[in-house]
């Protein structure tokens, strides 16, 4: 299953992913997704996307550790985590609140 830079726009992403897990795909790939590494005790942060003005779009930044743990709990292990260089994403405006945010591709494999 391939999520091409879209899961961050799903309002109920965990419910949707649980439906996907029931299908038991061998691999699940996420590309172009923003993850934060701070010690903020939240699964997600909601941010406003401003590069498509005049439209207003909100999306999730995912807590990297919690996202990986959610998949592990649901029977999937992370086999690859790589920086996505297709788009230059500037996260500087989130400092000092978020020190480390990355635009990543993640590949999970069924255990």
Feature roles, as predicted:
Residues 7-8, 34-36, 84-86:
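Short, solvent-exposed loop/turn segments at secondary-structure junctions
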Residues 24-48:
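Conserved beta-strand signature within the Rossmann-like core of class I S-adenosyl-L-methionine
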Residues 55-84:
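Short alpha-helix
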Residues 19-20:
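Class I S-adenosylmethionine-dependent transferase superfamily signal
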Residues 1-13:
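A short SAM/SAH-binding and catalytic strip from SAM-dependent methyltransferases
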Residues 82, 87-111:
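Core SAM-dependent methyltransferase catalytic element
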